[in-house]
Amino acid sequence: NNHGRGLLCIGHPGRGKTIICTKIIPSIIIDSCNLITNIYDATDLNNLIDKILKNRIVCIDDIGTEGEYVKYGEHRVPFAELVDLAEKKGTLLILTTNLTVDELRVKYGERVVDRLRAITNVIYFKGCSLRK
């Protein structure tokens, strides 16, 4: 039981985070709950943030790779917006990143990391790369 919390999967490249979060977990959710999830790459955040924020379950791969976003002269941090609204609306987040918690804090700030800890279970992927 996840107690309504999503997942924040952290680890070096090649540890299996993307496969688990974009292939296996969505298959389980769709099969067992009849819910459809949309899977996005972090670079999609800039162009699709408004659409993404409307979903009940959101899977974002490779958090920390997205660039700065300016819309109508306004600087936005789509990932921070996503985390903020996910907390307010109860959106389930499934996230992967190669960044450490400290690197996430530097990139997005303490507020975002604190909210992430509140709404996700952090799972660390350790070991050697599974890629050949």
Identify the function of each model-found stretch.
Residues K17:
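Conserved lysine of the Walker
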Residues P13:
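The conserved Walker
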Residues C9:
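Hydrophobic anchor at the beta1->P-loop junction of P-loop NTPases
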Residues I20, I24:
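Hydrophobic positions on the alpha1 helix immediately C-terminal to the Walker A/P-loop
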Residues N1-G4:
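Phosphate-binding P-loop
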Residues P26-E66:
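AAA+/P-loop NTPase substrate/partner-engagement loops
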